């Protein structure tokens, strides 16, 4: 008789039912983490064109990649939450759900009659997560928000860029949106753990603004200590040197020395040991005070060889160093493949799940995002009110 190895569970949240009322990016990113980790996620979309991001490019055929990344593996149903029949289906979902996630502007769920207090009456174990631009409380609670607005109002744009340049959005990604999604996931996971002990649900209130402030870290600490907002410093580190982009003979690369020992090792390997004993550079506070002169001295030595040479020898000397890669080069790194961070979903490549948990599969292929109302008929039947059944 041939023994078969039992299949691994889908993820630690296998069996969890998530009702997903979120749209665009900050909420869907949080619920996608739950989905990747095994939860069954039902995305409720409004009549018409559904989630706005279905109309966002880039496209592969008629498929929005923007929408696909943060909705892969979910089910879609169109419900009009002002229609009595659809409201009944929604409430039946709530009765059976573990988690409800929403990112409407504060007040919308109240007007629909679906705030936490009302839904907790029919499901006291419900974890109800709200993610908004500025939170459910405070003078800016009802202020409309997109990623760039939150970056501007959090101070991060004023702290980003070069001293002689304008305030700069953290580009290449929607940082504030993703902060909201990550902290929504953290709140949901924490509340689920607490529910195991208390048997009770909870209301989670997270915001893009709060998350971005938390990520500001050293900038807020600098202001707290000095009373002054930190100046823009380009690619340098606010407290350590050398910690910057440096020009080699052919192209730039990055060197990061977090202590005096690493700085001495760097000076030795690039053939400039005298820099380690130069009074301007002996200790970190000296190097910080003379950062411009330090960079000039290092780049003089680095100009003698191409970046590939320095990346090799500096790395072998134990000093943190790295190449400057574009997105295509990063995607093609063997490390990216080794970590399964480019996966196939719905026939297209996209970022994988960065959370690796022993005992659970991390599949290279995941289900794609649903078409609008793709599972609508089946879900209406599954969650029909008892009297309708």
Swiss-Prot record:
One MF annotation (Gene Ontology) recorded for this entry: acetyl-CoA:oxalate CoA-transferase
Catalytic activity, reaction form: oxalate + acetyl-CoA = oxalyl-CoA + acetate
Transferase in keyword set: yes
Role summary: Involved in the catabolism of oxalate and in the adapatation to low pH. ACOCT serves to prime the oxalate-induced acid tolerance response (ATR) cycle by producing substrate for oxalyl-CoA decarboxylase (OXC) and formyl-coenzyme A transferase (FCOCT). Catalyzes the reversible conversion of acetyl-CoA and oxalate to oxalyl-CoA and acetate. It can also use formyl-CoA and oxalate to produce oxalyl-CoA and formate with significantly reduced specific activity.
Subunit structure: Homodimer.
Family: Belongs to the CoA-transferase III family.
Protein name: Acetyl-CoA:oxalate CoA-transferase
């Amino acid at each position: 008789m041939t023994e078969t190895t039992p299949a691994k569970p889908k993820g630690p949240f296998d069996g969890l039912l998530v009702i997903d009322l979120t749209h665009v990016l900050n909420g869907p990113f949080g619920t996608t983490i739950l989905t990747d980790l095994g939860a069954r996620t039902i995305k409720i979309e409004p009549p018409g064109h559904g989630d706005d991001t279905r109309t966002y490019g880039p496209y592969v055929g008629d498929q929005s990649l923007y929408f696909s990344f943060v909705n892969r593996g979910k089910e879609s149903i169109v419900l009009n939450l002002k229609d009595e029949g659809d409201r009944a289906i929604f409430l039946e979902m709530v009765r059976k759900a573990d988690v409800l996630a929403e990112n409407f502007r504060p007040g919308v769920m109240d007007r629909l009659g679906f705030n936490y207090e009302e839904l907790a009456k029919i499901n006291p174990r419900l974890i109800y997560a709200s993610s908004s631009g500025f939170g459910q409380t405070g003078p800016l609670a009802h202020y409309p928000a997109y990623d760039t607005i939150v970056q501007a109002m959090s101070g991060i744009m004023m702290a980003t860029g070069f001293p002689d340049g304008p305030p700069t959005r953290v580009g290449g990604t929607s940082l504030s949106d993703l902060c909201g999604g990550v902290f929504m996931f953290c709140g949901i996971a924490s509340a689920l753990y607490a529910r195991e002990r208390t048997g009770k649900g909870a209301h989670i209130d997270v915001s893009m603004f709060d998350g971005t402030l938390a990520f500001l870290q050293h900038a807020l600490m600098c202001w707290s200590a000095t009373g002054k907002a930190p100046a823009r410093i380009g690619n340098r580190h606010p407290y350590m040197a050398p910690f910057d982009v440096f020009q080699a003979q052919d192209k730039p690369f990055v060197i990061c020395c977090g202590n005096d020992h690493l700085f001495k090792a760097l000076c030795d390997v690039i053939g400039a040991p005298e820099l380690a004993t130069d009074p301007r550079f002996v200790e970190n506070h000296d190097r910080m005070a003379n950062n411009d002169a330090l960079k000039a001295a290092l780049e003089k030595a680095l100009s003698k060889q191409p970046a590939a040479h320095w990346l090799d020898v500096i790395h072998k000397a134990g000093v943190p160093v790295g190449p400057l890669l574009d997105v295509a080069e990063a995607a093609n790194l063997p490390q990216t493949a080794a970590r399964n961070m480019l996966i196939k979903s719905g026939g297209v490549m996209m970022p994988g799940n960065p959370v690796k948990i022993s005992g659970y599969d991390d599949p290279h292929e995941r289900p794609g995002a649903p078409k609008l109302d793709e599972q609508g008929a089946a879900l209406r039947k599954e969650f029909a009110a008892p009297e309708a059944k």
